[in-house]
């Protein structure tokens, strides 16, 4: 049974109904419809914390999806799941792939910065200040990208950049 039919949440049900109506009336190919259905089911599973099911749906959505913009959001969501699972190397890979297809995805840049900053903090705890600085410099670059796209957002990152002398 498609996930859209088992959601218990009123908003999720309403969104699913609207999405199904749009799929019927907007001219789309069968591949686009299939990709969207898997993507929608992946988002639903992800919102419920069912990450394995969400990943399965996202990977299935990637098969028929050819639009780079749409693929970027699938890749971004896969990155989110890997981040949640503590798989930071995989997460960075998926965020990077998302940005390759859609460079106007500030949340991917922000998440990459957060991971790099975290790794910098880990390096400090391990006593390696040189490695920490390299991670912090990389975090700064990703945050600058995110801020350039959405100047009013990421205030904490802007403050960190200013405090550490990395804001230009």
UniProtKB/Swiss-Prot annotation:
Name assigned to this protein: Photosystem I assembly protein Ycf3
PANTHER family (UniProt xref): CELLULOSE SYNTHASE OPERON PROTEIN C, TPR REPEAT-CONTAINING PROTEIN MJ0263
Provenance organism: Nuphar advena (Common spatterdock)
GO terms for biological process, alphabetical: photosynthesis
Keywords from the named record: Chloroplast, Membrane, Photosynthesis, Plastid, Repeat, Thylakoid, TPR repeat
Keyword Chloroplast: yes
Gene Ontology CC terms, in alphabetical order: chloroplast thylakoid membrane
Subcellular location: Plastid, Chloroplast thylakoid membrane
Membrane topology term: Peripheral membrane protein
């Amino acid at each position: 049974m498609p996930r859209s039919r088992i959601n218990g949440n009123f908003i999720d049900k309403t969104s699913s109904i609207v999405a199904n109506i749009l799929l019927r009336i907007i001219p789309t190919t069968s591949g686009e419809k299939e990709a969207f259905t898997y993507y929608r089911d992946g988002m639903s599973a992800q919102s419920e914390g069912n990450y394995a099911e969400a990943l399965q749906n996202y990977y299935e959505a990637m098969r028929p999806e050819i639009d780079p913009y749409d693929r970027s959001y699938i890749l971004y969501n896969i990155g989110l799941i890997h981040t949640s699972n503590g798989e930071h190397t995989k997460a960075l890979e998926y965020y990077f792939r998302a940005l390759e297809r859609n460079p106007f995805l500030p949340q991917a840049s922000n998440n990459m910065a957060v991971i790099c900053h975290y790794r910098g903090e880990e390096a400090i705890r391990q006593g390696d200040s040189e490695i920490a600085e390299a991670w912090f410099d990389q975090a700064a670059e990703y945050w600058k990208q995110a801020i350039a796209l959405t100047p009013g957002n990421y205030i904490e990152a802007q403050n960190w950049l200013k405090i550490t002398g990395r804001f230009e």
